Amino acid sequence: MLDIAYIRQNPDEVAAMLRHRQLASEEPKLQQLLECDRQRKELVQRSDEQKALRNKVSKEVAEIKKKGVGSPDELISQMKAVSDAITAMDSRLSELEAEMENLLLALPNKLHPSVPIGRSAEDNMVFGEPVHFEHSLNFPLKNHLELGKALRILDFERGAKVSGAGFPVYVGKGARLERALINFMLDMHTEQHGYTEVFPPFLVNQESLRGTGQWPKFADQVYYIGEDDLYAIPTAEVPLTNLHRGEMVETNALPISYTAYTACFRREAGSYGKDTRGFLRVHQFNKVEMVKFTRPEDSYTALEEIRHHAQAILEALKIPYRVLLLCSGDISANATKCYDIEVWSPAEEKYLEASSCSNFEEYQARRSNIRFKPDSKSKPEFVHTLNGSGLATSRLMVSLLEHYQTADGHIRVPNVLQRYTGFTEI
């Protein structure tokens, strides 16, 4: 959530941000917010004046009663009228503040100056050079669906029977390989990258979704359990960030770095017509997440660290990939800057998103009220929060199976995973 003071002082800058994000249609809401803010300031001033008058009259009534000279009735009547006016103003003030809160929650984050201006994903910039690894694939390739079915390690049909489309089943060595990927990534992040492992809840309350920005904007993307008023997490970013919701974080504890494995659940509303085969679009998938809380001045250095940590996983697995710097029209509403890391699918002959690494600056911290004091004499400030997929296993599994397939239809297990699987080939 943006600071209303920043919006008030920089309305043209916020309007330009909306246009850069291809959200020019939201500008009337910005004007509505500014008008609510103007009315609120006027109302607060009038209410304060009336409260001062009420206090003055109240003292005069007390003085008359104390001296026993004259009648306070006229002043009491005046005080009642003032009190009624204050009640009405306070009621309207509550309405204005609620309206402002809703408008602020819906407003996207500002953009970092380095974010390229563009309309859609076609305008994203390739960051650096694509990274290649040599794999001997000089034979007719099978895609991940064909490999999974032939080797009986993936079963999408039975997953659909149990839960519906988009719920994969890993079987035998496929399940072992998935678990190996998760354990390898967690070990790398905790042992080499300095993260603390967390195993969080997979169900969260609405306040948690609100804190990280998934609510209310993406309410149609999450699974809701009505009887208990809980939501299945779309990403571990939600519970990890909300661990410190409403807290004053110890300054010497910053930066805080968490990593977690969770299953993730997404309805993917509006995905009709998109490629939904196999792992390309699923409702449940596994992901290892990285989340950081930093001082404001350190957050962009931390973003580069998170990106490097995600890339390190792919380099250890020898999976070809590229990094994209997302443009203003494709970046998420919550992020000020975001990198996507895409893995290459040799069978599909295209890149597939496997990780997003984002800086939210104080956007989530303001919504979640996560603060710190730079020093004992300073006022509290909001921390900056960041997150990165480190990584989602579904698209990663596509690339891994296709790159490590052999001419006779088997799968070689990457060297770094063999100590986790206990076998070298599927």
UniProtKB/Swiss-Prot annotation:
- This protein's pathway: Aminoacyl-tRNA biosynthesis; selenocysteinyl-tRNA(Sec) biosynthesis; L-seryl-tRNA(Sec) from L-serine and tRNA(Sec): step 1/1
Q: What class of enzyme is it?
A: ligase
What keywords appear on the UniProt entry? Answer: Aminoacyl-tRNA synthetase, ATP-binding, Cytoplasm, Ligase, Nucleotide-binding, Protein biosynthesis
Supply the EC number(s): 6.1.1.11
An example GO BP is:
selenocysteine biosynthetic process
Subcellular location per UniProt equals: Cytoplasm
The record lists the catalysed reaction(s) as: tRNA(Ser) + L-serine + ATP = L-seryl-tRNA(Ser) + AMP + diphosphate + H(+); tRNA(Sec) + L-serine + ATP = L-seryl-tRNA(Sec) + AMP + diphosphate + H(+)
Binding residue positions for L-serine: T235, A236, E237, E289, S389
HAMAP family recorded: Ser_tRNA_synth_type1
Q: What is known of its domains?
A: Consists of two distinct domains, a catalytic core and a N-terminal extension that is involved in tRNA binding.
Q: What is this protein called?
A: Serine--tRNA ligase
Organism of provenance: Chlorobium chlorochromatii (strain CaD3)
